[in-house]
């Protein structure tokens, strides 16, 4: 997010009424800040989740809004990438019973399952990037909050979203398998995951817009997460007795292509495009931390956080911001500095991003974990300059965990990583709200407020600081680079997934509204629309001019499915309803028979579904 080729650049300050912590006097020690801000981040994510959050009016259950901001900039949409990274964070917390935060596993799993259901719908939504029929529509980066396509000009397609979504869902599917719920993993999760894996296998060698939605080329971040997704997808397919031919054949070729981004000094974030940029970019830091494998060695081929390439790249990236931000004045090399997307950035004035400064810390915590697990660290010609910032006399060589050099270096690097968190602490308002950016001169938060991705980034960074890491994704068996690169993508097959996740967690108190999804089978023609109305205000009180519209986003020639998600009916309310069609000339055609009757349920599940067939 979110300067695109189609949007003008403006400097817009966020005008919230906030109190700021002094950059020169910490309001609390780092440990206390981490504890409080971690809980604040959980709240921030929850508030931005549709079907639950207080800041998501009109948002479908399971969708994350990027931010509650509706203007300057307008981020009141759902992005596939941001959402996938956020739900992966929550799935990791779910697997460790909430990670010590004040959120229950029941609440986490409800959110996870609602997310899965929402993505099953979004995969089927035709959009400016294409349709599900040939998979092209899966590359659409953002959607309206009501599950409809965003039709405005944008940097599309973006090819990281399907890979990130697949990785998140595979993680949850693996949990289901390990907890005796293999049938749910196979019947509900796999069809959604398979679509995304097919997309990666088919389109990985096509150019697309980068994660900042600005340049059209080949992106390091995109290719890195695509490689991981196919490796994990192959493993899941084997567990479920499914087939993913593209997973095994294409993952090595993606890894082969990924080596093209290393220029000998740092990772060039984007290639195969005409640009004057240096290629130094947060893109590469995020690529390493989102393909971090706690069981991996310090492999250069996969750019693991402890690898010589990742460390050299980290130094080049951080150092590129030292002289361009006023708030970095006087900060020497080897000390944490505020960082942004890339040094040439001009969006909203080109400022530090909270998630960037947090990512700089997270990569170092990942590296520390890997060194401690391996029991040594290696200083090579490639990584020497990085290590010299912490010990000017260090020489190339291998240092065991028992050596004084190892202890000196790792202690200094941990302090360096903590320094990035301290900067976030210094520039976070006293209410804990994390915006997208903070001003390069004044440190005032700006751009979109309460950015979901910022909150998720805080949680993952501090989890890694505590050596709480996700499960291995199989890097050890997938780090061998083929001797010859061969681009031979596999044309995918795609399947519409119509059913919502039958959640067994999450309950609805009798005083709350309950989201209900109505599914209707009816054969219609182009221009004919379907509505429902009833004796409650949410359905228009029998007024056909104010009925509730159904959408045909899941409609196919073989499955004439219309659906509507109604969210404003109080739990326990009995009501009548009926479907009708509106012809192109405005004529209303009612279905036959008596009024249908339904009682909005209390208890579980939290998102009930009603399946109907048009009565002729």
Predicted region positions:
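Low-complexity, Ser/Thr/Pro/Gly-enriched N-terminal "stalk/linker" regions
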Residues: 20-81, 114, 118-143, 327
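CBM-like carbohydrate-recognition segments
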Residues: 51-64, 68, 125-129, 133-139, ...
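Acidic/His metal-coordination segments adjacent to aromatic residues that form catalytic metal sites
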Residues: 64-72, 139-156, 201-218, 262-273, ...
């Amino acid at each position: 997010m979110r300067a695109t080729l189609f949007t003008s650049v403006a400097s817009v300050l966020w005008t919230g009424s906030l109190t700021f912590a002094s950059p020169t006097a910490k309001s609390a020690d780092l440990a206390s800040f981490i504890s409080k801000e971690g809980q604040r981040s959980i709240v921030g994510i929850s508030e931005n989740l549709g079907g639950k959050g207080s800041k998501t009016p009109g948002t479908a259950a399971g969708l994350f809004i990027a931010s509650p901001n509706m203007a300057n900039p307008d981020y009141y949409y759902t992005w596939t990438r941001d959402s996938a990274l956020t739900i992966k964070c929550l799935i990791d917390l779910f697997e460790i019973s909430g990670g010590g935060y004040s959120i229950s596993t029941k609440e986490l799993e409800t959110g996870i399952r609602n997310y899965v259901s929402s993505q099953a719908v979004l995969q089927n939504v035709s959009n400016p990037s294409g349709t599900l029929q040939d998979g092209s529509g899966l590359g659409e980066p953002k959607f309206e909050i009501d599950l409809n396509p965003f039709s405005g000009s944008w940097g599309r397609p973006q090819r990281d979203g399907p890979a990130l979504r697949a990785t998140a869902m595979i993680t949850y599917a693996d949990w289901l398998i390990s907890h005796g719920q293999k049938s749910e993993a196979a019947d509900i999760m796999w069809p959604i995951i398979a679509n995304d894996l097919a997309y990666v296998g088919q389109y990985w060698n096509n150019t697309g817009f980068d994660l900042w939605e600005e340049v059209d080329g080949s992106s390091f971040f995109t290719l890195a997460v695509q490689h991981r997704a196919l490796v994990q997808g192959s493993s899941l397919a084997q567990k479920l007795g499914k087939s993913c031919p593209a997973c095994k054949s294409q993952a090595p070729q993606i890894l082969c292509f990924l080596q093209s981004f290393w220029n000998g000094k740092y990772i060039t974030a984007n290639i195969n495009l005409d640009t004057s940029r240096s290629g130094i970019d947060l893109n590469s830091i995020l690529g390493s931390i989102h393909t971090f494998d706690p069981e991996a060695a310090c492999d250069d081929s996969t750019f693991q956080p402890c690898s010589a390439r990742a460390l050299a790249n980290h130094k080049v990236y951080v150092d590129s911001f030292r002289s361009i931000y006023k708030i970095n004045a006087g900060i020497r090399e080897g000390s944490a500095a505020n960082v942004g997307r890339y040094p040439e950035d001009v969006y909203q004035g080109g400022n530090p991003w909270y998630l960037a400064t947090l990512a700089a810390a997270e990569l170092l915590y990942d590296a520390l974990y890997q060194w401690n697990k391996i029991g040594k660290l290696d200083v090579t010609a490639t990584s020497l300059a990085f290590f010299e910032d912490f010990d000017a006399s260090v020489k190339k060589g291998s240092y065991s965990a028992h050596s004084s050099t190892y202890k000196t270096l790792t202690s200094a690097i941990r302090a360096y990583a903590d320094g990035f968190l301290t900067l976030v602490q210094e520039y976070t308002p006293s209410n804990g709200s994390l915006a997208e950016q903070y001003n390069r001169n004044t440190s005032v938060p700006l751009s979109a407020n309460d950015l979901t991705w910022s909150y998720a980034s805080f949680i993952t960074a501090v989890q890694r600081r505590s050596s709480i890491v996700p499960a291995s994704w199989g890097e050890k068996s997938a780090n061998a680079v083929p001797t010859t690169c061969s681009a031979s993508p596999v044309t995918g097959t795609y399947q519409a997934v119509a059913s919502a996740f039958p959640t067994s967690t999450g309950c609805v108190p009798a005083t709350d509204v309950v989201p209900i999804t109505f599914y209707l089978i009816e054969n219609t023609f182009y221009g004919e629309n379907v509505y429902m109305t009833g004796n409650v205000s949410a359905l228009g009180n029998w007024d056909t001019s104010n009925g509730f519209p159904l959408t045909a986003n899941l409609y196919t020639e073989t499955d004439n499915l219309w659906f509507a998600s109604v969210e404003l009916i109080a739990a326990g309310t009995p009501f009548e309803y009926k479907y009708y069609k509106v012809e192109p000339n405005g004529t209303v055609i009612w279905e036959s028979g008596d009024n249908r009757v339904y009682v909005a349920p209390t208890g579980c599940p939290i998102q009930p579904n009603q399946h109907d067939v048009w009565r002729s």
